[in-house]
Curated annotation (Swiss-Prot):
A Pfam family per the record: ACR_tran
TM region positions: 14-34, 367-387, 391-411, 419-439, 476-496, 503-523, 562-582, 904-924, 929-949, 960-980, 1004-1024, 1036-1056
Topology within the bilayer: Multi-pass membrane protein
Entry keyword annotation includes tRNA processing: no
InterPro entries from the UniProt entry: AcrB_DN_DC_subdom, Acrflvin-R, CusA-like
Family note: Belongs to the resistance-nodulation-cell division (RND) (TC 2.A.6) family.
Annotated Gene3D superfamilies: Multidrug efflux transporter AcrB pore domain (3.30.70.1440), Multidrug efflux transporter AcrB pore domain like (3.30.70.1320), Multidrug efflux transporter AcrB TolC docking domain, DN and DC subdomains (3.30.2090.10), Multidrug efflux transporter AcrB transmembrane domain (1.20.1640.10)
GO molecular function: monoatomic cation transmembrane transporter activity; xenobiotic transmembrane transporter activity
GO biological process: response to cadmium ion
Keywords for this protein: Cadmium, Cadmium resistance, Cell membrane, Cobalt, Membrane, Nickel, Plasmid, Transmembrane, Transmembrane helix, Transport
Function: Component of the NCC cation-efflux system that confers resistance to nickel, cobalt and cadmium. May form a membrane tunnel, which allows ion transport across the membrane.
Gene name linked to the record: nccA
Full protein name: Nickel-cobalt-cadmium resistance protein NccA
Length: 1076
C-alpha cells in the first residue's frame, strides 16, 4: 500500500501539492485559533464545601460540621480523595474526584449529599460549594484603592466628592467618611456593588473574590446598663428591629375602573430610622432603639484583610471557570476592568497587580523564539550537508507544514499551545524521515545521471524518485514506528505528571505523524517537481572530508572491534557511575517573574495585628529597586477558595523586568536573598519564599504549599504536634532544607465562658437564654437589612469593641429574668450565671480521608528533591520514634516524582520489548536486532554526561529527553543496517558490506543527528521565561545524540561485522544462514 502511495504521489504530484497547500491553509487558520497558555491544566477535579459557623471552636467545628459532611460525602461514587480543615468558625472539606468524572454531575451529587447532612448540622448552618474553578483559577488580581491613599497630593475642593480639607472623604452620595473603618468600608462597597457584578459577566469567569476593607454594616451598639434599667433583653431589641423593618404586599384596589397596586413598605432606610424604631412601652411611654443603643455605620468583624505598598486596600481576584483558557480570560478581565474604571466614583482607582496573561505571553515568546531559532539551524544544516538548495528547501518545507497540520489535531483534541505541548517540538527530530528520503533521492539521481551521462528524462527522473523513496520507506516506516513506541510510556502517566506531559507527547506524535505522511506524499512529489536540472555528483566538502577521515577509522573498527567495544563499555560504566551523582526532582520550577512571601505568626495574632506587620514588610521589600509592587492578602476572602487563618499572610512581590534590575543582580536567587535580608529584622514572622503559581501547584497536589511535606497521621493531636516538632528539628538539620515549618495546631488562646447550670436554674432561666445573650453581645446578631438600590447592608446588634474586650463590662452584662406580672422586669449580671477563664485551645484540625493529620513542610534549595527526601527519611527513621498507631507519608512534589518513577520502571521495559519486536520484523534477524538496540545505552550515556556537566537534576522532563534520543538512535541504527543488508543481498562479503554500507549512510546519519540535536540548541541555552522547563529535555537530547552518533558510525559497524562473520561461519552447506 505504501508503495502505491509513493507511486501515486509522484505521478499525481501537482494534485498532491495542491492538496498539501489546502491542508496547510486550514492548519494556518487552526493555528490562529489555538488557545495559548503557560502550562497544561494540571488541576484535579474537586469540589470545595465551605461552612461558616462563627460561634464554634476548631474541635467543635470538626465534631459538629466537618465530620457530618465528610460522612455524608464518603462513599459517593467517583471520590478519589477527601481532605478537610477545621478552624475557629470555619470548615472546609475538599472532595477530589477521579479524572473520568463529570464535574458538574458530581457537584449535583454533592448537593444531594449535603441535603442529607443538614439535619446533623447546627441550626442555621448552611454549607456552600465553592465556585466552579480550579486551584490555579486565580488568573487576575487587582487592588481597589484611593488614588491618593492618605489624601496627600489630591486636589481638594470642599463640598465636592473626594478628599476634603479636614482629611475626610466625601462620597458621590454625600456620605462623609471620617475614620479608617468607614474609608475602607467604602472601598469594599465599591468592589462588592460596582466592580464585582460587572466583572462576573465576563466570559470564562466563574466568580470574583473579595478580600480586605470592611463589609459595610449598620451596627447597633446597646448600652447594657440602659437596657437593664428599661428591662429590655437582647432578644427583644433584635425582634423590635425585625418588626420595624417590613415590606408587605396588600394586593390591589379598584378606583374609577383602574387597578392600584397596594404597597405597605415599612423598610428602614437610614440609621435615623433605626434609632426611632420602638422596642417596647413602659408605663405608656415608647422606648426606642436610640434610647438604649448607639447606631453607627461601621464594618463587619472581619476575617481577612489586604494591603498594597504599605497601605490597606481591597483586593479582588477573578476566578477562571474550569476548562477555560487562562490567557483569554485574563485578557478579557483586563479589558473589562478598563471599562469598569469609567464607572468608578471620583477618587477611587483600580490597579491591576497580577495578570496571568503577561506570564503566558512571556512564556510563549520564549517557546516561539526557540522554535524559530531551532528551525533556522536545521535549515542551515540541510543547506550545508545536502549541497543542493532545492533539496534543502524540500526538506525544510516539512517543518512549517507539520506544525500547521499538528495545530489541526491539537484543536481537535482540545490541547492548548503551551510550554509543554510546543516547547518539546524539535523540528530536526520531526523531519528525520523526510531528510532520509530527500538525501537518498538526491544520491540516486546523481548516480543515475552519472551512469547515463546526460540529464534524465521526465520518465527516468520519476522512476528514480519512486525507486529511491521505495528503498528508504522500510527503514523510515519502522524508524517512525519505533519513535512512536518510545513515547508510549509518557502516555501512561497519571495524575499531575499525566496532565503535564501527555499533551506534549500527543503534540509531538501529531507532528511526527504529519511529517511521516508528508514524507510519503509531499516530499516525493516535490522531489519530482524541483530536482529537474543537473544534480551535482560531487559531495559537499564537509561530507567529503568527513568520509575521507572516517573510512580508515571505520576499517580499523571492523577489522579490530574489541578496542571500540571496550571503549563503549567503559563509557557505559562511567555513565552508570555518573548517574548516581545526578539529582532528582519532579519537574523544573517555572520562573514566574514574581515571588510570594508566605508569612505565618503565632496563632493568637489577630487580623489587625497581621496587617500591622504586613504594612512595614511591604515598605521594606518595596525599597529594593528590582521590586515593582508588593501587595498582601491576610486571612480568608469571601469565597474562601484559599482559606488562611488571621495569623497568616501571602505577600505577593511583583518584580520589574530583569533589564531594570540593579547592576550585579542577575538571578532570582539573589533577589530572594536580598528579600530575606530585608525581612530578617521583622519580628513574629516565619517566612516561606516561593512563587504564586508554584505555591498553589504544591497546595493543589499535596495539600501543602511547599516543595515537600512529611504528613503525620494519628488520633491524639498533642502527640501529633510533638512528633511534628521533632521531625521539623531533623529536617532543619538536613542539608538543602529551607523555610521548614510546622503549622501550629495548638496554642490558640481561648476565652471560655463556663455556664453554672445550678445558678441558671435558680433564676428560672435556661442555658439557651443565657447563651443567646452572650452570643448576641459578643459575636453579634443580624437583625434585618437596609436596601439602597441594588445594595443591601446588614443591621447587626453587638457590644462596642472596647466593651466586648472588658471583662468587668462583660460580667455586668444584664441577663433578663422571666417577666412577673405587675412588676418591672428584673435582670441578673452575667457573672452570677457563668465563669470566665482563659485557656489554650486548638488553632486548626486537618484530616485526610477521615484521618487526623499534621504536617511538616519545607522548601528545598541547593540540592535536588529526590536526594533530599532520601537523606531526610533516613535521619527521621534514626532519630524520631513514632508512638503506636502513628505513621508518616511523604507528600508534595516528591510524591509525584515517586509515582512517575515507579510507573516508568514498569512501562519502559515493556516498551523496549515492543521496540525489539518491531525491529525484528524490520530486520528479520535477532542478532542484528540486538545490534541496533546497542545504540540505546550509549545514547542514554551521553544524556547522563550532559546532565552532569550542566548540573541539571533528573526530572520527568529529562526522562522525556532520554526517550526521544533513544528513538533517534534506533532510527539511525536501522538506516545503517538497511544499507548493510542491501549489500549483503547483492553478494558482498560481510566486512565489505559493513564498510560500504556505513560509508553510504554517513551523510544521512550525520544529518539526522545534527538536525535533531541542533534543533534543541536554542532550548538548551535559552534564558527567557519558561526556559528552565525545556533545558533538561534539550540537554539530554544533545548529549545523547553525540554519543549515539559515535556509536552508529563506529561501534555499531564493529558489532555488526562481528555478528555477520559469525553468521558466515555458521552458514549451512546449502548457503542458508543459521539464525544467530
Amino acid at each position: 500500500m505504501i508503495e502505491s502511495i509513493l507511486s501515486g504521489a509522484v505521478r499525481f504530484r501537482w494534485l498532491v501539492l495542491f492538496l498539501t497547500a489546502v491542508v496547510g491553509a486550514i492548519g494556518a487558520w487552526q493555528l490562529n485559533l489555538l488557545p495559548i497558555d503557560v502550562t497544561p491544566d494540571i488541576t484535579n477535579k474537586q469540589v470545595q464545601i465551605n461552612t461558616v459557623v462563627p460561634t464554634l471552636s476548631p474541635v467543635e467545628v470538626e465534631k459538629r460540621v466537618t465530620y457530618p459532611i465528610e460522612t455524608a460525602i464518603a462513599g459517593l461514587n467517583g471520590v478519589e480523595n477527601m481532605r478537610s480543615l477545621s478552624r475557629n468558625g470555619f470548615s472546609q472539606v475538599t472532595v477530589i474526584f477521579k479524572e473520568s468524572s463529570n464535574l458538574y454531575f458530581m457537584r449535583q451529587q454533592v448537593t444531594e449529599r449535603l441535603a442529607q447532612a443538614r439535619p446533623n448540622l447546627p441550626a442555621g448552618v448552611e454549607p456552600q460549594m465553592g465556585p466552579v474553578s480550579t486551584g490555579l483559577g486565580e488568573v487576575f488580581h487587582y487592588s481597589v484603592e484611593y488614588e491618593f491613599p492618605d489624601g496627600k497630593g489630591a486636589k481638594v475642593k470642599d463640598g465636592e466628592p473626594g478628599w476634603q480639607s479636614d482629611g475626610s472623604f466625601l462620597t458621590e452620595r454625600g456620605e462623609r467618611l471620617t475614620d479608617r473603618v468607614s474609608k475602607l468600608a467604602y472601598l469594599r462597597t465599591v468592589q462588592d456593588w460596582i466592580i464585582r457584578p460587572q466583572l462576573r459577566t465576563t466570559a470564562g469567569v466563574a466568580d470574583v473574590d473579595s478580600l480586605g476593607g470592611y463589609v459595610k454594616q449598620f451596627v447597633v451598639e446597646p448600652d447594657a446598663a440602659k437596657m437593664a434599667a428599661y428591662g429590655i433583653s437582647f432578644e427583644e431589641l433584635a425582634q423590635a428591629l425585625e418588626d420595624a423593618n417590613l415590606s408587605v404586599g396588600a394586593n390591589f384596589i379598584r378606583r374609577s375602573g383602574e387597578s392600584y397596586l397596594v404597597r405597605a413598605d415599612a423598610r428602614i432606610k437610614s440609621a435615623d430610622e433605626i434609632a426611632r424604631a420602638v422596642i417596647a412601652q413602659r408605663q405608656g411611654v415608647p422606648i426606642t432603639v436610640g434610647q438604649v443603643a448607639n447606631i453607627n455605620v461601621g464594618g463587619e468583624l472581619r476575617s481577612g484583610a489586604a494591603s498594597r505598598n504599605g497601605y490597606e486596600t481591597v483586593v479582588g481576584s477573578a476566578l477562571m471557570l474550569v476548562g477555560a483558557n487562562s490567557r483569554t480570560v485574563a485578557q478579557a478581565v483586563g479589558d473589562k476592568l478598563e471599562e469598569i474604571k469609567k464607572t468608578l466614583p471620583p477618587g477611587v482607582v483600580i490597579v491591576p497587580t497580577l495578570n496571568r496573561s503577561q506570564l503566558v505571553m512571556a512564556t510563549i515568546k520564549t517557546v516561539a523564539k526557540n522554535l524559530v531559532e531551532g528551525a533556522a539551524l536545521v535549515v542551515v544544516i540541510l543547506f550545508a550537508l545536502l549541497g543542493n538548495w532545492r533539496a534543502a528547501v524540500i526538506a525544510a518545507l516539512v517543518i512549517p507544514l507539520s506544525l500547521l497540520i499538528s495545530a489541526i489535531g491539537m484543536n481537535g483534541l482540545n490541547i492548548s499551545g503551551n510550554l509543554m505541548s510546543l516547547g518539546a517540538l524539535d523540528f530536526g527530530l520531526i523531519i528525520d524521515g523526510a531528510v532520509i528520503i530527500v538525501e537518498n533521492s538526491l544520491r540516486r539521481l546523481a548516480e543515475r545521471q552519472h551512469h547515463e551521462g546526460r540529464l534524465l528524462t521526465l520518465k527516468e527522473r520519476l522512476e528514480e524518485v519512486i525507486l529511491s523513496s521505495r528503498e528508504m520507506v522500510r527503514p523510515t516506516v519502522y524508524g517512525q514506528l519505533v519513535i512512536f513506541m518510545v513515547f508510549l510510556p509518557c502516555l501512561t502517566f497519571q495524575g499531575v505528571e499525566g496532565k503535564m506531559f501527555s499533551p506534549m507527547v500527543i503534540t509531538l506524535m501529531l507532528a511526527l505523524a504529519s511529517a511521516f505522511v508528508l514524507s510519503l506524499t509531499f516530499v516525493p512529489a516535490m522531489v519530482a517537481v524541483l530536482l529537474r536540472k543537473k544534480v551535482s555528483e560531487k559531495e559537499v566538502r564537509v561530507i567529503a572530508v568527513t568520509k575521507e577521515r572516517y573510512r580508515p577509522l571505520l576499517e580499523r573498527a571492523v577489522a579490530r572491534p574489541m578496542p571500540f567495544l571496550g571503549a563503549a563499555l567503559v563509557t557505559l560504566a562511567l555513565a552508570a557511575m555518573a548517574f548516581t551523582f545526578v539529582g532528582r526532582e519532579f519537574m523544573p520550577t517555572l520562573d514566574e517573574q514574581n515571588l510570594n512571601l508566605s508569612s505565618v505568626r503565632i496563632p493568637s495574632t489577630s487580623i489587625d495585628q497581621s496587617v500591622a506587620i504586613d504594612l512595614p514588610l511591604e515598605r521594606a521589600v518595596l525599597s529594593l529597586p528590582e521590586v515593582q509592587t508588593v501587595y498582601s492578602k491576610a486571612g480568608t476572602a469571601s469565597l474562601a477558595a484559599d482559606p488562611m487563618p488571621p495569623n497568616a499572610s501571602d505577600n505577593y512581590i511583583i518584580l520589574k523586568p530583569k533589564s531594570e534590575w540593579p547592576e550585579g543582580i542577575t538571578t532570582k536567587e539573589q533577589v530572594i536573598e536580598r528579600i530575606r535580608e530585608k525581612t530578617a529584622p521583622m519580628v513574629s514572622n516565619n517566612y516561606d519564599v516561593t512563587q504564586p503559581i508554584q505555591m498553589r501547584f504544591n497546595e493543589l497536589i499535596g495539600g501543602v504549599r511547599s516543595d515537600v511535606a512529611v504528613k503525620i497521621y494519628g488520633e491524639n493531636l498533642d502527640d501529633l504536634a510533638s512528633t511534628a516538632q521533632k521531625i521539623a528539628a531533623v529536617l532543619r538539620k538536613t542539608p538543602g532544607a529551607t523555610d521548614t515549618r510546622v503549622p501550629l495546631t495548638g496554642g490558640f488562646p481561648t476565652f471560655d465562658i463556663v455556664f453554672d447550670r445550678a445558678a441558671i436554674a435558680r433564676y428560672g432561666l435556661t442555658v439557651k437564654e443565657v447563651a443567646d445573650t452572650v452570643a448576641a453581645a459578643m459575636a453579634g446578631r443580624p437583625s434585618g437589612q437596609i436596601f439602597d438600590g441594588d445594595r443591601r447592608y446588614d443591621i447587626v446588634i453587638r457590644l462596642p469593641g472596647q466593651q466586648r474586650e472588658n471583662l468587668d463590662v462583660l460580667g455586668a452584662l444584664p441577663v433578663m429574668l422571666p417577666a412577673v406580672e405587675g412588676q418591672p422586669r428584673a435582670s441578673v449580671p452575667l457573672r452570677q450565671l457563668v465563669q470566665f477563664r482563659f485557656t489554650q485551645g486548638l488553632n486548626e484540625v486537618s484530616r485526610d480521608n477521615g484521618k487526623r493529620r499534621v504536617y511538616v513542610e519545607a522548601n528545598v534549595g541547593g540540592r535536588d528533591l529526590g536526594s533530599f527526601v532520601d537523606d531526610a527519611a533516613k535521619r527521621i527513621a534514626a532519630e524520631v520514634k513514632l508512638p503506636p498507631g502513628m505513621y508518616i507519608e511523604w507528600g508534595g512534589q516528591f510524591q509525584n516524582l515517586q509515582a512517575a518513577t515507579q510507573r516508568l520502571a514498569i512501562i519502559v521495559p515493556l516498551c523496549f520489548i515492543l521496540i525489539a519486536a518491531t525491529l525484528y520484523m524490520a530486520i528479520g534477524s535477532a542478532a542484528l536486532t540486538a545490534t541496533v538496540l546497542t545504540a540505546v545505552p550509549l545514547a542514554l550515556a551521553g544524556g547522563v554526561f550532559a546532565l552532569v556537566l550542566r548540573d541539571i537534576p533528573f526530572s520527568i522532563s529529562a526522562s522525556v529527553g532520554f526517550i526521544a534520543v533513544s528513538g533517534v538512535a534506533v532510527l539511525n541504527g536501522l538506516v545503517l543496517i538497511s544499507a548493510i543488508r542491501k549489500r549483503l543481498e547483492d553478494g558482498a562479503a560481510p566486512n565489505e558490506a559493513v564498510i560500504e554500507g556505513a560509508m553510504e549512510r554517513v551523510r544521512p546519519v550525520l544529518m539526522t543527528a545534527l538536525v535533531a540535536s541542533l534543533g534543541f540548541v536554542p532550548m538548551a541555552i535559552a534564558t527567557g521565561t519558561g526556559a528552565e522547563v525545556q533545558k533538561p529535555l534539550a540537554t539530554v537530547v544533545i548529549g545523547g545524540l553525540i554519543t549515539a552518533t559515535v556509536l552508529t558510525l563506529f561501534v555499531l559497524p564493529a558489532v555488526c561485522g562481528m555478528v555477520l562473520r559469525r553468521q558466515k561461519k555458521l552458514e549451512k552447506p546449502g548457503g542458508e544462514l543459521l539464525e544467530a
